[in-house]
Each structure stands twice: as structure tokens, then as C-alpha cells.
UniProtKB/Swiss-Prot annotation:
Component of the ribosome, a large ribonucleoprotein complex responsible for the synthesis of proteins in the cell. The small ribosomal subunit (SSU) binds messenger RNAs (mRNAs) and translates the encoded message by selecting cognate aminoacyl-transfer RNA (tRNA) molecules. The large subunit (LSU) contains the ribosomal catalytic site termed the peptidyl transferase center (PTC), which catalyzes the formation of peptide bonds, thereby polymerizing the amino acids delivered by tRNAs into a polypeptide chain. There are 2 genes for eS8 in S.pombe. InterPro entries: Ribosomal_eS8, Ribosomal_eS8_CS, Ribosomal_protein_eS8_euk, Ribosomal_Se8/biogenesis_NSA2. One of its GO terms (molecular function) is structural constituent of ribosome. The lineage of its organism: Eukaryota, Fungi, Dikarya, Ascomycota, Taphrinomycotina. Residues 1-41, 124-145 are annotated as: Disordered. It comes from Schizosaccharomyces pombe (strain 972 / ATCC 24843). It is found in: Cytoplasm. It comes from the Eukaryota. Belongs to the eukaryotic ribosomal protein eS8 family. This is Small ribosomal subunit protein eS8B.
Length: 200
């Protein structure tokens, strides 16, 4: 028996069993979940209805994540699954799905921030390098003009100090073969931090 997406096999609202009036159809088929794990990239191509292709990611270790408030995206390493709104089992097994909260490597975003603003991440207005390399006046003007926008949320700053950022997966790894998403910040970050805090 194959996996099917029909509702004829379900009982009615009153609890009555429905009579079977036809067999399963090809257009109702479903497939096993991909259960994408963290590891060296392994993607299977699946031929689907209409001759189209789906890309079933079985293992992924990186993805493109965007930092919304700064308007920048970087490819970065996925470290682990920290929280999942639907199932704790997916956290325990490090399964990547859409809307999973993952920890990603902060290094690419830190490097971008320090070159863009010319200040060290987590240092109140200090210059970027311990051994100052001479910068052209043009670069200095650019950095000083950008300084007003360099404010980072304190919760995000502590994550940068630890080298790991919380992000949400917004793509569907079992369908598109990619694990892309965005960094959590603001109200959304505080909401998930409360959810992940150990219960007393």
C-alpha cells in the first residue's frame, strides 16, 4: 500500500466509516518525508507529476541566510537545530525542515559588519583593527557616514560574541534541496528565546 493524500479513508464527522467506492489514484500519491539531517551535502532528484523535478535533500551543512535589518545575505554553515515549533523529536535528531530554528556560524556576517562599518562587532565605537592599517580618506568618510546605522540589538550582539546566531529556515529542504532562511531579530527573536528558555 502506498502513501496517499486522499481523505476518503477518514471517518466522517459523526464517526461513521465511509464506504470504499474507488481505489487509490496516482495523482493522490504521497512520498516518505526526507528527514534532512546536518552533514555533507547529499541531494536526490525526484521525478514528479508533469515531468517536473523535486530535489530531495537528505544531508545539508550550509545555506544562504539573510540579515533583514542590514539587507545582506551570506552563505554560512548550519551548526545545529535549536528549536522546532511542531516537534521536539526533530530537535533531538537535528532534522532540517521549514520553520526550524537553527544555529548558524556568525563569522561571515561579523566579517561583513566590520568591513562595512569599520568597527569591531560588540565594541562600542572602537576601531576595527588592533594594528591600524591606514585607510584612505574616502573609506573613512564612508565609515563615518554609516556609523549612525551601526546599532545592533543587544540579544544579537551576545550571539555574535558566542559566534552563533539563531536563524529560521524559510525554504523547504525536502522539496527544493536548499536550506535558506533569515536571522532572528527583534520581537521574533525574543519570542523564540522565551520558548527555548528552560522551564522552571
Amino acid at each position: 500500500m502506498g502513501i496517499t493524500r486522499d481523505s476518503r479513508h477518514k471517518r466522517s464527522a459523526t464517526g461513521a466509516k465511509r464506504a470504499q467506492y474507488r481505489k487509490k489514484r496516482k495523482f493522490e500519491l504521497g512520498r516518505q518525508p526526507s528527514n534532512t539531517r546536518i552533514g555533507p551535502k547529499r541531494i536526490h532528484e525526484v521525478r514528479v507529476r508533469g515531468g517536473n523535478k523535486k530535489f530531495r535533500a537528505l544531508r545539508l551543512d550550509s545555506g544562504n541566510f539573510s540579515w533583514g535589518s542590514e539587507g545582506v545575505s551570506k552563505k554560512t554553515r548550519i551548526i545545529q537545530v535549536a528549536y522546532h515549533p511542531s516537534n521536539n523529536e526533530l530537535v533531538r535528531t537535528n532534522t532540517l525542515t521549514k520553520s526550524a530554528i537553527v544555529q548558524i556560524d556568525a563569522a561571515p556576517f561579523r566579517v561583513w559588519y566590520e568591513t562595512h562599518y569599520g568597527i569591531l562587532m560588540g565594541s562600542k565605537g572602537k576601531k576595527a583593527t588592533a594594528t591600524p592599517t591606514p585607510k584612505s580618506k574616502h573609506v573613512q568618510r564612508k565609515h563615518s557616514a554609516r556609523l549612525g546605522d551601526s546599532k545592533v540589538d543587544s540579544a544579537l550582539e551576545t550571539q555574535f560574541a558566542a559566534g552563533r546566531l539563531y536563524a529560521v529556515v524559510s525554504s523547504r529542504p525536502g522539496q527544493s534541496g536548499r536550506c535558506d532562511g533569515y536571522i532572528l531579530e527583534g520581537e521574533e527573536l525574543h519570542f523564540y528565546l522565551r520558548r527555548m528558555a528552560p522551564k522552571k
